[in-house]
Structures are given as structure tokens and as C-alpha cells.
Amino acid sequence: MARKVVVVDDEKPIADILEFNLKKEGYDVYCAYDGNDAVDLIYEEEPDIVLLDIMLPGRDGMEVCREVRKKFEMPIIMLTAKDSEIDKVLGLELGADDYVTKPFSTRELIARVKANLRRHYSQPAQEVSGTTNEITIKDIVIYPDAYSIKKRGEDIELTHREFELFHYLSKHMGQVMTREHLLQTVWGYDYFGDVRTVDVTIRRLREKIEDDPSHPEYIVTRRGVGYFLQQHD
């Protein structure tokens, strides 16, 4: 069965070009041209991936991303004419998986679509989640086979990537991992983003698992090097 792609862009010529080229690659493609229609379309079609422009009439891309993330975990690639670091970081914090700055190469964008689909829907690598045994860290329990974690018996909702990152750190307890290493290992060698993606995902994780994210007890920063998961007796 063909993968479903939703393209959201208020510039119809761009949406048409993307639709044409994605269909040539064998994808089923659905288009929306404003934020409100985009949310309705995504909820109706439940696509495998979304290409989402930031500048949209109605709701902007950031609002659409936030709304979609309330229910869905499919990869979201942000399309933006802004080459601003704050836009990229904000998009990632809201749950986007990747971003492309306009003007972009259609070939490059399709490569990113394929890479994001492959990473998100393929079986996790053995190194990241090969065990089915529960892992307990203080009051957190990781269930690798169920792709879930609990803290003090309560479920903590993590995205696919957040879980993989936390699980990988748990398998290397106390070892400092550089951002570059985490990007290559958890996101994959074909990921097009930069190490800021790791920082954003760590920040989201801390907000979900730490009692006080500003004074983390689990995921600790080694300044100038990277991150590690603190051991607890």
C-alpha cells in the first residue's frame, strides 16, 4: 500500500509541483492550502508524513503542528521561507521532525521524505531498542517492547524519537554522549538536521520526565561535551 503524504502550502504552484513529483515516486498525495483545511485533512486522511509550510492563512504552520501533535506522531517536515534559527528551533520544539528552507530542491525534499519515513516506520535498530527487558531508573520504568515509559506508575507520553533517545541513553547509563554521536545513532546517518535537534529533544524530554526541568536529576548536561543519563542507586 502506498504511503500517504499531506502537502500544506498556500502557494498552489509549489504544492502542485510537490504533488506531481511525489506521485511519480509512488506516494498518495493530498493537498491543503490553509491551516484550517490542513488540520481537517490530516485528521481525515491520517497520512504517513506531512510537509507543512510555516506561513499559512488561517492557522499558521506552528499552530497546525501543535494541533496535529495532540493526536498523531507521523513525521512532520516544516517548509519555510524564513532562514531564522528561532523558527527552526520553535518548529522542532512543537514536534516537527525536520525542516527545509525555501527555495529548496525537489530532489532533496523527496530524499528527506524517504529518510523520515524510513526512520519512523522501520524496526528500531538493535543497539537502540533490541532488548525486551524492563529498565528501571529510580522511579522511572522503561518498557522497550511497548515503546513506553512510566514514572511512579503513571504513563508518560513520548514521541517516537523522544523514546528512542531516552532508551539509548538508558542503555549507556553514566556515559557522556556527544550531540553528534546521538544525532548519528538515534536519528540516523542520513538525517539532514543539525545538533540543535538533539538539544530541543532533550529539552522536551526533561519537561516530561523531570520534577524540575531546570535542575534535572535524570538527563544531565556535561557542558561543552554532551549529555548522559544519571545513575541512581
Swiss-Prot record:
Sequence positions bearing 4-aspartylphosphate: D53
Transmembrane segments: none
Official protein name in the record: Transcriptional regulatory protein WalR
Classification via Pfam families: Response_reg, Trans_reg_C
Gene name of the record: walR
Domain of life: Bacteria
Portion annotated as DNA-binding: 132-231
InterPro entries: CheY-like_superfamily, OmpR/PhoB-type_DNA-bd, Resp_reg_WalR, Sig_transdc_resp-reg_C-effctor, Sig_transdc_resp-reg_receiver, WalR-like, WH-like_DNA-bd_sf
Organism: Staphylococcus haemolyticus (strain JCSC1435)
Modification comment: Phosphorylated by WalK.
One of the GO BP terms on file: regulation of DNA-templated transcription
Lineage: Bacteria, Bacillati, Bacillota, Bacilli, Bacillales
PROSITE patterns the UniProt entry points to: OMPR_PHOB, RESPONSE_REGULATORY
GO molecular function: phosphorelay response regulator activity; transcription cis-regulatory region binding
Keyword DNA-binding: yes
